[in-house]
Amino acid sequence: MKEEDIRIREAIRKRLIQCRTDNNLTQTDVGRVIGKSKNAVASWEQGLSLPDIVTLYHLSIYYEKSLEFMMGEEE
């Protein structure tokens, strides 16, 4: 895996955790909002997998953040 891919994957993982905890949500809560399981959300946050782009887009809308923010490209 390329270094840039690893950086983006880690940024997404951290942003997902940050957005969820900043909003006082559980992984179950997030899963319900986007129609995914708690296990899927946990897998993303552990860096085992990534949400697809459509799911990441829906999360960015829910959290009122840009896709660039979710990918670690802006503060």
Enumerate the language-model features and the residues they cover.
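Residues within the helices of the helix-turn-helix
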Residues: I17, T28, Y57
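The alpha-helix within a helix-turn-helix
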Residues: R20, G31, S60
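The DNA-contacting recognition helix of HTH DNA-binding domains
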Residues: Q27, K38, L48-S49, L67
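A short, Lys/Arg-rich alpha-helix, primarily the initiator
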Residues: M1-D22
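Short alpha-helical DNA-recognition segment
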Residues: N23-S43
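Residue-level detection of the helix-turn-helix DNA-binding "recognition helix"
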Residues: T21, G35, Q46-L48, E75
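DNA major-groove recognition helix of helix-turn-helix/homeodomain DNA-binding modules
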Residues: V54-F69
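Short amphipathic recognition helices of helix-turn-helix/homeodomain-type DNA-binding modules
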Residues: F69-E75
